Amino acid sequence: MKDYNRISLRTQALFDLTHTLARPWLEHTEYPWEILSDIPAVIREIGATLPTDLYDHPAEDIWIAKSATVAPTAFVGAPAIIGENTEVRHGAFIRGSALVGDGCVVGNSTELKNCILFDGTQVPHYNYVGDSVLGYKSHMGAGAITSNVKSDKSPVVVKPASGFEGDFDPIPTGRKKFGAMLGDFAEVGCNSVLNPGTIVGPHTNVYPLSSVRGAVPAGAIFKSGKGSEIVGKE
């Protein structure tokens, strides 16, 4: 699969930055995980500039679009921004440090922590998203989660996914907490686990019940079985 290299992992290759309020900060990163430590500060800085005719400010460091729907049983912790026309459903748990874009769905029993959801992202059923960036119109099926800490607590290193040899050396991130980066339009099947440091390229499909570790290229299909397999869509 061509063009599967370090360049394909860069922020500009994974995301259309016009679909997030974090664009000015992401534009200054080479790789998107570089923003993870700054998410709380980014949210506070953006929040202070949001127009009061479009956003409510119900508590310190929390901004919720007037057009958004937040169920009474959902919890939104600071700092957080909930974008326009976004739906936060019953039982959702936004722990804090969550920048949720426009037109998103955060569903029942979904937990968000230190993450950016681009516009149109859906995490609608029993998802955990921690220390992650989810691109425009990406979607996680029911029960799909990001695992953000390695069992031995060692720093995360980004590598090619099992089953495919990418044209790049392992990239140390220096982070002990790092979930996943989902490119625009990425689809993650039900009950899949995205292990620490997973990168899913734009327009890539991850089959249900997959255990993904490493970087999966754009426009691919990832399957788990006796071993992992990556195949082209055509």
Q: Where in the sequence are the language-model features?
A:
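Short, solvent-exposed linear motifs at loop/edge-of-secondary-structure regions
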Residues: 30-34, 117-119, 184
